[in-house]
Amino acid sequence: MKFIMKFIKSNKGQISLEFSLLVMVVVLSAIIVSYYLIKTAIETRNANMDVINQSSNVAEKSLSNVT
């Protein structure tokens, strides 16, 4: 436990450089992963909308030919 506290805090009670760099890397990684997750979700939504529109058009054409 002492090692962990020594890793987190320096002698003057400030957050150590290693710990602050670790936190910064974790936060930046989370931001990058979130960006790509949102980007992928938007692309998937757009692709699904295209499929729905195509299916709707095919169904509409098929039903318009029925007399």
Curated annotation (Swiss-Prot):
Post-translational modification summary for this protein: The N-terminus is cleaved by the prepilin peptidase EppA, which recognizes the class III signal sequence.
GO-annotated cellular components: cell surface; extracellular region; membrane
Database matches in InterPro entries: Class3_signal_pept_motif
Domain of life: Archaea
Motif (QXSXEXXXL): 14-22
Localization terms from the record: Secreted; Cell surface; Fimbrium
Keyword Cell membrane: no
Residue span(s) of the pro-peptide: 1-13
Keyword set, alphabetical order: Fimbrium, Secreted
Cross-referenced Pfam families: Class_IIIsignal
The keyword Secreted belongs to this UniProt entry's keyword annotation: yes
Record's comment describing the protein's domains: Contains an amino terminal motif QXSXEXXXL, which is part of a class III signal sequence.
Protein name, per record: Probable pilin MJ1400
